[in-house]
Amino acid sequence: MTALKNDRFLRALLKQPVDVTPVWMMRQAGRYLPEYRASRAKAGDFMSLCMNPQFACEVTLQPLERYPLDAAILFSDILTIPDAMGLGLYFETGEGPRFKKVISTPADIEALLIPDPQKDLGYVMDAVSTIRRELNGRVPLIGFSGSPWTLATYMVEGGSSKDFRKTKAMAYDNPQALHLLLDKLAQSVTSYLNGQILAGAQAVQIFDTWGGNLSAAAYQEFSLAYMRKIVSGLIREHDGRKVPVILFTKNGGLWLESIAEAGADALGLDWTCEIGDARRRVGDKVALQGNMDPTVLYAKPEAIRNEVARILASYGKGTGHVFNLGHGITPEVDPEHAGVFINAVHELSAQYHQ
C-alpha cells in the first residue's frame, strides 16, 4: 500500500510525537456541505449514497478537498449491521432510521444470523478499498461501527428512542435474551471491523452513542463488557502498522477509568468532560479524542478560536490528543466556520509540541 504522507493522526493515537495536534470531525462528510447535499440528491436518498461505493467514496473525500483534515472517515451508517441481519433499514423523512422488523422475543434473537462482511456487507468493504485507493496515502482512513448496546437499542425500539424503555425493560426482565443479542452483535461488529481493516481502514472507532443513558452498573454489564470483547478480537496490526482503536461513549465521562481498561488505544470524549481532567485521570493509559461542543461552530470565528485555544491549553503539552468535536457536526453549521475550527487547531497547537 502507498506510504502515508500525513500520519500525525495515527501517531497521536499511539502517543508518538507530532508537530501539531491532529484534527478531524465526526460527521465531517455531511449535510452542512453543499457538495454533500448535491451528491445525495444525485444518489436519490441516504441509503443509495451508503450502498454505492463510488458515491460513498465521493462524499468521504469532499471535506478533505475543503479542509486540511488529518484523517478521512468512511461514509456509512452504524445501522448497516442490523440491516444485514435482515431487519430492513429505511429512513423516514424527519423521523430518522426505522426498521421493518423489530426484535421483541427471544425467538427473534435466536433467528438472527451473524453477517458475513464480504457477502452481506460487501458494499462497505468495496467502499473502504475504493476510498483507500483514492486517498493515495494523503491521510489515514478510519473505519467504524456502532457498539452492541447502541445497535441493540435501535433493533429493539424499531428506531430512535428518547427513553429506550423496551431495551431497558428487556435488560431487567429478560437479561439472558439481551445478553444473547449483545453477544451476536459483538461477534458481528468484530468481524465487520476486521473486514474494514483488511479492506484498508487504518484505525477504527466504536460509537457507543447511547451507552451514557445506562446506569453505572448497567453500563458495565450491557455496554462496556461487549466493547471489551470486540477490542480483544480486533486485528491490531496490518500493512506493517498498528491499527489504533478508539472507543467513544457519549456521556461516559463518569466512567473513563473503566473504559480506559477496555484495551483500546484512545477514548473519545463528549463536550461535558474537561479534557485536562480526563488526561489526569486516564492519560497515562490512553490517548484522548475530542471534545469541543459542536454548537460552538455557530458562534463567531473569534469565539471558535478562543474555545479551541482553551481546550488545547486544558490538555496541555505533548502528544496523545486528537482534536475533534464532542459529537457530530450539525447540518446548519456554516462550512466557513468548520474551516476556522480546523485551521485554529493546527495553528494554535504547534506551541504544545515543541
Swiss-Prot record:
Pathway: Porphyrin-containing compound metabolism; protoporphyrin-IX biosynthesis; coproporphyrinogen-III from 5-aminolevulinate: step 4/4
UniProt name for this protein: Uroporphyrinogen decarboxylase
Main location: cytoplasm
Function, in words: Catalyzes the decarboxylation of four acetate groups of uroporphyrinogen-III to yield coproporphyrinogen-III.
Positions of substrate binding: 27-31, 77, 154, 209, 327
Keyword annotations from UniProtKB, A to Z: Cytoplasm, Decarboxylase, Lyase, Porphyrin biosynthesis
Molecular function (Gene Ontology), one example: uroporphyrinogen decarboxylase activity
Family, per entry: Belongs to the uroporphyrinogen decarboxylase family.
EC code(s) of this entry: 4.1.1.37
Subunit structure: Homodimer.
Residues carrying the site annotation Transition state stabilizer: 77
Primary gene name: hemE
The keyword Lyase is annotated on this UniProt entry: yes
Subcellular locations according to the entry: Cytoplasm
GO (cellular component) term, any one: cytosol
Source organism: Pseudomonas putida (strain W619)
Domain of life: Bacteria
A single BP term in Gene Ontology: protoporphyrinogen IX biosynthetic process from glutamate
